Amino acid sequence: MYRYEKKGPKRGVALYSYSAEFGLTKTLEDCFEDLHDMGAHGIEILANTHIENYPYPTDEWVEKWWRLCDKYEIVPVEYGNWIDSHVLGDRDLTTEESVEMLKRDIRLAHRLGFTVMRTKMPVINDLLEPVENWKEIIKGALPLAEELGIKMCPEIHTPSNLKGKLVNDFVEFIKETGTKNFGLNIDFSVFRTSFAEGEWVDPNYTPNKPEDIIPLLPYVYCCHAKFIHMSDDFKETTIPYEEVVKTMEDNGYEGYLLSEYEGADKYDEGYEVGQTLRKHHILLKNLLGD
């Protein structure tokens, strides 16, 4: 199993960036090759998109996965999963059924070498507040997560406020349980300060300040390094990357920054996101000095 031991923040890629190309013009190995070429060492996958025959991949597919990780020197960093309580249509899953769904993903994430899961829970409103029984669901899966060394992390995404109720509830849960197997994934969209003319902006959104992340860092096990627009001189023009990354680095963050591209142009015919990802990784290399 390939290991990457660099101290401080590390560079990786969320395969969601390839959403317009994966399965059409790019294979899983093509994505791995891209990551290796840009010097990334970590990967996030979306389980139901990137795992063949999910949730029951064959032994042959799993062997192929490990072969790709070793060949391209890539660490399995974050496994994206959903607790889809609405999957049945006519009724919501019970708490027990949701726990079993989550346990299934924990086992598969462990089988593929991941230590962090981006665990998306069903939400009840535009502020992304989770269903009322989220604590019971997480508690039901915690013993298995502890046994297998998996950290479950809901994604903190725009329009969430890092000082708001949603984040506070998660932090209080961590403190109350004392668990090291539940934490946060901070999506850099929460720091976005610039929007294109005519672009829709959530009325609930107020940009967070880079320093707002400092008290949360003990609970942050992974980050989506969201980016929207890269200039030709390797700057992200909508998010204050220099301030955010420096704040995290100065305050001891050791996890991965997973590049996640959400520019609308990636769905244009013929667009290749790999070139935009390379620009982003030049930015990260310049900031991190690697």
UniProtKB/Swiss-Prot annotation:
Heterooctamer composed of four alpha subunits (DfgA) and four beta subunits (DfgB). Transmembrane segments: none annotated. It is an enzyme of class 4 (lyase). Can also use other divalent ions such as Ni(2+), Mg(2+), Zn(2+) and Ca(2+), but Mn(2+) is probably the native metal ion. Activity is strongly reduced in the presence of chelating agents. Optimum pH is 6.0. This is C-glycoside deglycosidase alpha subunit. Keywords: Carbohydrate metabolism, Lyase, Manganese, Metal-binding. GO terms for molecular function: lyase activity; metal ion binding. Optimum temperature is 60 degrees Celsius. Carbon-carbon bond-cleaving enzyme which participates in the metabolism of C-glycosides. Acts on the C6-glycosylated compounds 3''-dehydroisoorientin (3''-oxo-homoorientin) and 3''-dehydroisovitexin (3''-oxo-isovitexin). Its EC number is 4.1.99.-. It catalyses: 3''-dehydroisoorientin = 1,5-anhydro-D-erythro-hex-1-en-3-ulose + luteolin; 3''-dehydroisovitexin = 1,5-anhydro-D-erythro-hex-1-en-3-ulose + apigenin. The active site is at H157 (proton acceptor). Gene3D superfamilies: Divalent-metal-dependent TIM barrel enzymes (3.20.20.150). Its cofactor is Mn(2+). Belongs to the C-glycoside deglycosidase alpha subunit family. It comes from Eubacterium cellulosolvens (strain ATCC 43171 / JCM 9499 / 6) (Cillobacterium cellulosolvens). Mn(2+) binds at E155, D187, H224, E260.
